[in-house]
């Protein structure tokens, strides 16, 4: 699946190099690579964590579509390990059931950065990778592993969507990170197009 032949040898070489790099850093199912990938510093930018607004999800799509599922599966670990905490966050902060994730996750259920930044979509964004993975492979063992997470994401949106005049709306979810000052100046975000797309796919 991952073999290609291109007219441009430089692009072809970069394609294989990108696969090699991704596979090299994404072999341990408990410790996927962080936002910086292969780079490390004493004081890493963005806390060196898993930023789950899109940064963590995107590289794994490349691995999945080329058939490298063993290397793409580590994507799921930070989400699955934090389910209990995110369920509690949802109950305390939003007063309903479901999985509500902060923006920055660490390994083994660690919240390394408890910022929400008026975003409700990180959990469903991660769910899409799981849905794509199952859609490509129809791997039932994988589906059983991620089903509780997907169910928790569904519970969240069933409770959080706001119905007005027979139409459901996404309220309080920004397309991008929003500060409290931004919300004061511009109002509560509603119906961000990315989240609408995630929900339609979900």
Residue ranges and their predicted role:
Residues 34, 40-49, 96-143, 148, ...:
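The feature captures the catalytic groove of carbohydrate-active enzymes
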Residues 21-24, 56-70, 120, 124-139:
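Alpha-helical support elements that line or immediately flank enzyme active sites
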Residues 14-17, 21, 75, 79, ...:
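Alpha-helical packing segments of well-folded alpha/beta enzyme cores
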Residues 4-11, 15, 52, 56, ...:
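Solvent-exposed, acidic/flexible segments
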Residues 1-49, 69-73, 81-88:
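Acidic/polar, glycine-enriched structural segments that form the non-catalytic walls/loops
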Residues 22, 61-62, 70-74, 80, ...:
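Structural recognition of the beta-strand scaffold that forms the well-ordered cores
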Residues 21-26, 77-90, 149-164:
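Long, well-ordered core segments of solenoidal/helical folds
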Residues 44-50, 58, 64:
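Long, structured ligand/cofactor-binding scaffold of large enzymes
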């Amino acid at each position: 699946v991952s073999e290609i032949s291109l007219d441009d040898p430089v692009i072809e070489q970069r394609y294989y190099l990108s696969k090699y790099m991704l596979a090299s850093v994404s072999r341990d199912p408990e410790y996927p690579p962080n936002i910086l990938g292969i780079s490390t510093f004493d004081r890493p930018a963005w806390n060196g964590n898993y930023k789950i607004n899109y940064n963590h999800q995107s590289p794994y799509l490349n691995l999945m579509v080329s058939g490298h599922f063993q290397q793409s599966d580590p994507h799921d670990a930070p989400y699955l390990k934090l389910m209990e905490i995110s369920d509690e966050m949802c109950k305390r902060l939003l007063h309903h059931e479901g999985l509500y994730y902060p923006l920055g996750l660490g390994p083994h259920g660690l919240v390394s950065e408890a910022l929400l930044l008026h975003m409700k979509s990180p959990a469903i964004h991660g769910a899409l990778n799981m849905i794509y993975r199952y859609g490509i492979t129809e791997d039932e063992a994988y589906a059983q592993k991620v089903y509780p997470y997907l169910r928790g994401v569904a519970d969240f949106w069933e409770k959080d969507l706001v119905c007005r005049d027979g139409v459901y709306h996404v309220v309080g979810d920004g397309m991008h990170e929003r500060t409290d000052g931004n919300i004061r100046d511009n109002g509560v975000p509603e119906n961000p197009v990315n989240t609408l797309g995630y929900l339609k796919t979900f």
